[in-house]
Structures are given as structure tokens and as C-alpha cells.
Amino acid sequence: MEKNDYKKIVASCFCSMMLVSSVWAQESDLYAGGTGSKSDPYLIETEAQFDAVRENRGSYFKLMADLDFASYEKEGGWWPLGEWGSGDGSDQRFSGTFDGNGHKISNLMAKHGDDTGAHDMSVFGVVDGGTIRNLLLDNVTVIGGGRLGILTGLTRNATIEQVGVINSSCSNIGTGSNSSGLVGPCAGTTVITDCYTADCNVMAKSTDGETGDAVGGIVSSGNATVMYCYCLLYTSDAADDKA
């Protein structure tokens, strides 16, 4: 091998290493620590870091502090972390693992500007193959249309465990609507365990006064395995009430 060729190879390797390091640095700046792996999850300490979960939807996360969104400003309002997206949308659905670590998220409003008919409005939005655990939501307000829940919208092949929702509301004013105090329409092998909702208002009623399709305290509709969950003091308005 000629000397110049060797130098080119070394330079190429160095540039590749710098590129990888740059990408890692950019991602690490989004969170309080971690690399997003199962053994080293991204650490969340602020509202902005929680918002940045959408940048790595398939990774592992751990909440390290209570979050209060009362003064958190986001142009257009909160948009769910997971989205259906265009095409099959697989890269936009939340498929990671979020461990709330016993902490609380409070005073979040999931309503995207004036788009009251937005689908899958919730905190996490579309969850496909993901896991959410050990989390409390307090005073969360969700307004939209289509598939709604306070924690998640459309939920498929997911695991939801030890999640509580209190003092919150979910108002679906679209047509053909679903609304839930915890999880929106479910599909696949979704399993919900040791969860509860209390003092929540759940409503599904379209703008033309027609009642919505389904509401529920834990899940609005679809197929899911629900174990050791309970719902207290919720109100609803829909044709099919699944409490």
C-alpha cells in the first residue's frame, strides 16, 4: 500500500469517528444523561427534555424529577410524542420504553392550536410496541377529535403498567370519536396492568351535538388485556360507555 493511500484511509476513519461523535453529542445534549439503551436510558429532568423524547421514539427513557408544564410554552401547543405519520408511519410512533420512576407530570394541555379535530391527542399519542410505566399524570387536559386518551391515543402491542391519572379531562369533539381517561383505542396484544384513573372527566361529543362512539375510564375501545385496574368518579357522554 502506498503511503498516500494509507493517509487517505486514516483520514477517512478519523472523519467517520468525528461524525459519530458529533451525532452522539447532539443527542446527549437533548437529555440529562444516558445513551438511550436499556442499561443506560436517557435521563429526563426538565419539561424540554421530556418534549425531546420525540427525537428518539424507539429508545429507553427514565424520568428523574416531577415535571410541571404550567409555564411551559410551545408554539401551537403540545403535540403528542408519537404520531401516525405518513405512509406506514412506523418511524414516528412511540415504540420505546418510558419509565416514570414514580414521578409526576402535571398541568399539561394537549391541544394543538385551533385544530380541535386533531387525532391521537394525548401525552404520548400513537404507541406501537412501546412500554410506559411508573408514572402519574395530574391535571392534564386533552382536547381533539378521533382517537383520544389522556395518556395515549391509538395504542397497539403496548405495555402500560402502574400509571395513574388524576384530576384530568379528555374532551373529544370530533365525529366518530373515542375518548378515555387513560388509553385510547387498543389493538394487537396491548396489556394494561395496575393502572387507575380518578376524578377525571371524559367526554365524546361532536360539534354538531351528536354523541361520540365510545368512552372509557381505562380504555375507550378495541382489544386489550386489562388487569388490576380501577376507575373512580368519571363522567362521560357517548353512545357506547365502556367505563
List PLM regions with ranges.
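Bacterial N-terminal signal peptides that target proteins for export
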Residues: E2-C13
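Bacterial N-terminal signal peptides
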Residues: S12-S21
